[in-house]
Swiss-Prot record:
Protein name: UPAR/Ly6 domain-containing protein CG9338
UniProt GO cellular component terms: plasma membrane; side of membrane
Disulfide bonds: C26-C72, C29-C37, C51-C89, C101-C115, C118-C123
Glycosylation site positions: N68
Propeptide: 125-147
Signal sequence, start to end: 1-23
Stored Pfam families: QVR (PF17064)
Extracellular side: 24-126
Family: Belongs to the quiver family.
Regions that span the bilayer: 127-147
Recorded superkingdom: Eukaryota
Alphabetical UniProt keywords: Cell membrane, Disulfide bond, Glycoprotein, GPI-anchor, Lipoprotein, Membrane, Signal, Transmembrane, Transmembrane helix
Major location (coarse): membrane
Taxonomic lineage: Eukaryota, Metazoa, Ecdysozoa, Arthropoda, Hexapoda
Amino acid sequence: MVSSVKMILALTVLATVACTGYAIKCYQCDSLTNSECGKDIKSDSSLVLDCTKMAPPRFLQNFFPVRNATGCMKQTIDIPGNPQIVRSCYFGNIADTKVGCQTDPSLTINKLLSCEVCTEDECNGTSSLAPIAGVILLFFGLARLLA
């Protein structure tokens, strides 16, 4: 009986962790309107957005049948003589960023200088080991419970 309860608990925890893995959270800001979004962003939860609440930009919607974000991105865009950093959710194929990284074609004066794409929560900002440490602790706690 106790073994069955432990197994159900373990499966519930694993299912919860797996489900939250699909909802990626990314920094959403630009350095033009928010100086905190510059080259070295400080950890600020007010700039973090749950990407499930965001649709792809209108100019990309014809390219992607799936409307879920697949990662986070950090773009450096040159607005004639003034490089700006834009952080947002990424929609598209992580392995082929040509389409997903493009800028709005109606803004013809903007030039994309770089685009970095990643697939972990808040990875388009300052890196943090806190999420990794939490998963490791959860794993060892679950292993101890099942032992």
